[in-house]
């Protein structure tokens, strides 16, 4: 028995499913998840001594690679000063200044500890600011495990084939309108049906939790136009894309491409904490000033702005310069080219969905692509399991769900890329040979 198997057996006796986040249990791909002992640069090492090239990157935060010396030094220095004070520190202001400086529409931000807290607070703030009750979300977009946003939420719910979550009351769900993604007409119809009642539309900047889905040209701009006309807020969830696809997040990528829209509120997470639990919401000063202590919308957190997490986030973002993003983009393009070559040679039907350096693989979608949650759920997901395990056996760690994005870092060098690319042909053949499950 492997050490990972032994630890997984122990974990299942004391934790639901043996994990603290469902996707880690490997339910959708099967097998025993490797228990990770250490990580450095682009590599993970498990408790059995196996090394993997990492294409999960802690679900995004490891932008410049694991255990980057600048980040670890900053964290060590912060730890020596104390783990937390329950009081305001210099690091909070410095990280806030850096984020506000990078993302032009931001005027103020509030640090929290998780992306879920950020989106939960953004919804409360939108309702408090507008005095309205309804919220619009899009099917397949994931905004954390906020009760009112779990309907058709993609990510873990899609992995587990669940439409929503038990424990969410009908009254809570009734305050959320769920619309098809990339459907401007549906959004216009919702506002026509509920004039003056919608507090906000929340959307992933570019969905990455039903696989990666590209917003159709003008979709985010249409959300901005429609919300503004009705007096509702637009909340752009950049928990995953923020500082991952561009130094100013997806908004920065879009702005660089010539788009001129901007939301009222942003949410950030993952990269902003450099691997430690940190997230934030931010936006226009007029809206943000509704948060306590300056306004009537309450939000608080004992560990919000934790000094060690601030140090990790600040060091990571300072290292994430133009060269780092260029490297990640180049490596992502190289991997996508190798993936296409291997899958084409194996005769597999597929499409690759991409936004900046982020991408995902969807089997059986060459003719249609993936434009919304219905498309994502219609893919030949059964082909991903043998593909995943062939890569894992070859020492490449992929997301253990077909509904998640692939991540690279600035630390993925030629050696790491060679290992990934050499593993792809056998994995592609395994996917080609896969058979659909029997009814």
Swiss-Prot record:
Main location: cytoplasm
InterPro entries hit by this protein: 4pyrrol_synth_GluAld_NH2Trfase, Aminotrans_3, PyrdxlP-dep_Trfase, PyrdxlP-dep_Trfase_major, PyrdxlP-dep_Trfase_small
Residue ranges of coiled coil: none
Keywords tagged on the record: Cytoplasm, Isomerase, Porphyrin biosynthesis, Pyridoxal phosphate
Record localization: Cytoplasm
Recorded catalytic activity of this chain's protein: (S)-4-amino-5-oxopentanoate = 5-aminolevulinate
Descriptive protein name: Glutamate-1-semialdehyde 2,1-aminomutase
Species assigned in the record: Kocuria rhizophila (strain ATCC 9341 / DSM 348 / NBRC 103217 / DC2201)
This protein's encoding gene: hemL
